[in-house]
């Protein structure tokens, strides 16, 4: 099971750089714009790899499967819309601007991390996702609507499909009795979660 899951992850990670291989820009970019574009391509791969590292460190095998499924679902929705809408990119390189694939994937990752592992991992992930979205606009690959749509798609999938990881959760049945009479009152479930 773990071998198949890791193979699927490797295939998805190898496919990610392909999303950055759109046609050549039809406008002149500054050195800064080219550098920011490259950094967004790097983060497109680095963020899921870091998330994978967190999950492996926590031995969260189920979470890895959920994350891979969310990434695949995000790619399907995003590319379905890209090929249905045919919006021209600001740099003129192709007609697949809406929605931003980079934004949708990194916001799926950030939402997954925030929901699954908490704010200590989630806040930096959202900051990086915000940088990627900004960088796609600055690098003339998208306009603001493209990255907002990508962020909305990614965040929705990540937040709706992820459950918090509670490795240290303990749940136990509890019977309550009246201290005066010793008679049974109700049954409940109690528990603790250690983070």
Segments the model singles out, each with a brief description of its role:
Residues 49, 70-74, 150, 154:
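Hydrophobic alpha-helical membrane-embedded or membrane-associated segments
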Residues 54-73:
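Interfacial segments of alpha-helical transmembrane regions
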Residues 50, 66-67, 110:
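Residues at structural and domain junctions
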Residues 47-53:
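Hydrophobic core of alpha-helical transmembrane segments in multi-pass integral membrane proteins
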